[in-house]
Amino acid sequence: MLSTRIQCALALLSLALAVCSVSAAPTDAKLRQLLQRSLLNPAGKQELARYTLADLLSELVQAENEALEPEDLSRAVEKDEVRLELERAAGPMLAPRERKAGCKNFFWKTFTSC
């Protein structure tokens, strides 16, 4: 029983490593290409620096977004709850808006009747 669990865990681990290595492959090829260009051309060093900076910034933004997701979800839930409470508090006591005869409003480049 224990050996089958270990085998399953190892199989899942190897599968996860294989997926991670495959997903990282294109960036390695791009980096290798930029390194070859930088050796041949001095302007390639600047391109390499831009690429590494962009890669670093994208990783930081992704980590920040992952860290903020739970907080944003809780804030959104709180806002929805407040909105629902306000709607319930207003209830049927609010009378529908009465429109005057011949009244027109200017909305988005056209006149609409009130």
Swiss-Prot record:
Keywords: Cleavage on pair of basic residues, Disulfide bond, Hormone, Secreted, Signal. Residues 25-88 form a propeptide. The gene is sst1a. Disulfide bonds join 103-114. PANTHER family: SOMATOSTATIN. The keyword Metal-binding does not apply. One of its GO terms (cellular component) is extracellular space. It comes from Carassius auratus. It comes from the Eukaryota. Somatostatin inhibits the release of somatotropin. One of its GO terms (molecular function) is hormone activity. Pfam families: Somatostatin (PF03002). GO terms for biological process: regulation of cell migration. Residues 1-24 form the signal peptide. Belongs to the somatostatin family. This is Somatostatin-1A. It is found in: Secreted. InterPro entries: Somatostatin, Somatostatin/Cortistatin_C.
